[in-house]
């Protein structure tokens, strides 16, 4: 551990204590030596006693900087781990930091391009268009075609700072896990590992560029989503160049109203976009907060979304997709028994779970929702409530499902902000039912067979040889098993014989000893003793030597 990491660790502890976060720790995590260290090494007064725990955690993370802000944003979606109060407070964290010097941005860009900016771009603006904790965006014009572009560049030394904070977080998580015990449902080390994978993915702008290209290709002919063109020849791990867009932020409702945007169509398209990305493409944008979503300025009566920042993308396994679709359908059919079964079948909840108790818990939580009109039922909150209920049954929430839940909450929130009367169920149900029909019907079976057909056709000439080899292997296995069985039976026979002789010798030795004590002149005790010694020797020598079969 370096001096810098020790200094950073002290700063983190000091900040957490200034906000009194040690007061909210469970007794297991505050043994006597913790309290001793708290009152001696860290004699720091809690300056925020009058504020609730969730708000104190939010303020502390805001002060600790970008890595902790992003961790807080991720934790805000983990309502299977945190209470509503804490999760809601963390959801308000904003990734806003002052920009770094434009001259440093120029140096970083030219280091990646290995050429002066002016040789490739005109009108490079050193004043950033936007600034975040990991990267910064500058505008320019592409010299080759005169088109407006944006250059996204990583902050100087951001990787080193993030790696140092991640190492500190990982060590702290392991300590917390040790104090709480292995069975604790919080699983801090697992949470930090999920976060590490997510944030390190954002540090590679080349990967983000590839994600953007893939998402763009998925929606090339779409009326719902436009992804700006990426100039891949200018993309590197620390630099990304893409088309500049001139949309309206999705959160600027006044500007959208002023241009006469069709809000109902826009909200419905947002829902369709989510389900298309998840169920058709299995590749969804997992960071769709208002800062990354814009609306087109042209054709407000037929508006489309513009998606930016593809640093965090999610995918689901085929199994997870099917279980998720069935979960939604079962919920709206009020089939709580099926929901409980799905959670167990998918492995999200242990197969040892009491099915009836789990079903009843789901019913208690979900049934009151049906007292509302369908257009007031929140898909995102359905997932939240189900995860929260499953938390008491030790649910294991997969990272990809957390990303999905986060995306669904964003999309649904945006949809209802644009058009409060949005009936998410009416928009989503046909899509889900059609997808399920495609997955389990005759067409799906034919599609799966046709997909595998080229592979089977390629392997068909090898079938006779494979069958012969398997039969040959089967004969060898049978022969080997027979040999093992023979060896085992022989071993058992030897063991029985040896045990019989040893037990008999023990009986003779005991009898001889007892008789000789009564009358040493008789020859019988000596016969017993000698016979016992001989039998013991024979029995010991006849023990089976090899236990390998």
UniProtKB/Swiss-Prot annotation:
Its pathway, per UniProt, is: Cofactor biosynthesis; ubiquinone biosynthesis [regulation]
A biological process from GO:
regulation of ubiquinone biosynthetic process
EC number in record: 2.7.-.-
Localization of this protein: Cell inner membrane
One Pfam family hit: ABC1
Q: Where does the record place the catalytic residues?
A: 287
Residue intervals passing through the bilayer: 496-516, 520-540
InterPro entries assigned to the protein according to its UniProt record, in alphabetical order? ABC1_dom, Kinase-like_dom_sf, UbiB, UbiB_bact, UbiB_kinase
Membrane topology is:
Multi-pass membrane protein
The record's annotation in CDD domains points to:
UbiB (cd13972)
**Entry keyword annotation includes Cell membrane:** yes
* Annotated NCBIfam families: PRK04750.1, UbiB
Q: Which family does it belong to?
A: Belongs to the ABC1 family. UbiB subfamily.
Q: What is this protein called?
A: Probable protein kinase UbiB
The species this protein was found in: Shewanella baltica (strain OS185)
Gene it is expressed from? ubiB
């Amino acid at each position: 551990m370096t001096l810098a990491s020790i200094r950073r660790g002290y700063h983190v502890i000091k900040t957490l204590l200034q906000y009194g976060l040690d007061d909210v720790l469970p007794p297991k995590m505050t043994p006597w030596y913790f309290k001793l260290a708290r009152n001696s090494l860290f004699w720091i007064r809690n300056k925020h006693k009058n504020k609730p725990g969730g708000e104190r955690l939010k303020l502390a993370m805001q002060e600790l900087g970008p890595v902790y802000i992003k961790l807080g944003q991720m934790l805000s979606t983990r309502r299977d781990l945190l209470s509503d109060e804490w999760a809601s407070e963390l959801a308000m964290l904003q990734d806003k930091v002052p920009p770094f010097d434009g001259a440093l941005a120029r140096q970083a860009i030219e280091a990646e391009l290995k050429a002066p900016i002016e040789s490739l771009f005109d009108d490079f603006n050193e004043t950033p268009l936007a600034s975040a904790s990991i990267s910064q965006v500058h505008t320019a014009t592409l010299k080759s075609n005169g088109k407006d572009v944006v250059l996204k560049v990583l902050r100087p030394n951001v990787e080193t700072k993030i790696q140092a904070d991640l190492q500190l977080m990982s060590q702290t998580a392991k300590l917390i896990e040790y104090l709480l015990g292995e069975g604790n449902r919080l699983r801090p080390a697992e949470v930090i590992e999920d976060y590490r994978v997510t944030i390190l993915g954002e540090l590679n702008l080349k990967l983000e560029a590839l994600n953007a290209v893939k998402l763009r290709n998925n929606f090339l002919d779409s009326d719902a989503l436009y992804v700006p063109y990426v100039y891949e020849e200018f993309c590197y791990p620390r630099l990304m160049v893409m088309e500049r867009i001139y949309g309206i932020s999705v959160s600027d409702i006044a500007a959208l109203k002023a241009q006469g945007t069709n809000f109902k169509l826009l909200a419905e398209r947002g829902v369709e976009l989510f389900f298309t990305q998840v169920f058709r493409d299995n590749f969804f944008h997992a960071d769709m907060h208002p800062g990354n979503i814009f609306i087109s300025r042209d054709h407000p009566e037929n508006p489309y979304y513009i998606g930016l920042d593809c640093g965090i993308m999610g995918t689901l396994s085929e199994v997870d997709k099917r279980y998720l679709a069935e979960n939604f359908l079962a919920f709206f059919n009020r089939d709580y028994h099926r929901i409980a079964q799905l959670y167990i079948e998918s492995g999200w909840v242990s197969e040892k779970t009491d099915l009836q108790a789990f079903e009843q818990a789901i019913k208690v939580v979900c049934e009151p929702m049906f007292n509302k009109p369908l257009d007031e039922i929140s898909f995102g909150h359905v997932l939240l409530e189900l995860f929260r209920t499953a938390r008491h049954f030790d649910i294991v929430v997969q990272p990809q499902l957390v990303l999905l839940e986060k995306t669904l909450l964003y999309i649904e929130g945006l949809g209802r902000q644009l058009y409060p009367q949005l009936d998410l169920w009416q928009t989503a149900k046909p899509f889900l039912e059609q997808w399920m029909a495609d997955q389990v019907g005759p067409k799906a079976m034919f599609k799966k067979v046709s997909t595998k057909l080229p592979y089977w056709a390629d392997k068909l000439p090898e079938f006779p040889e494979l069958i012969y080899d398997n039969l040959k292997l089967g004969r060898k296995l049978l022969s080997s098993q027979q040999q093992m069985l023979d060896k085992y039976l022989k071993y058992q026979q030897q063991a029985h014989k040896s045990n019989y002789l040893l037990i008999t010798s023990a009986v003779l030795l005991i009898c001889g000893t007892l008789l000789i004590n009564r009358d040493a002149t008789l020859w019988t005790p000596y016969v017993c003793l000698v016979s016992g010694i001989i039998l013991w020797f024979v029995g010991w020598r006849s023990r089976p030597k090899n236990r390998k079969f």
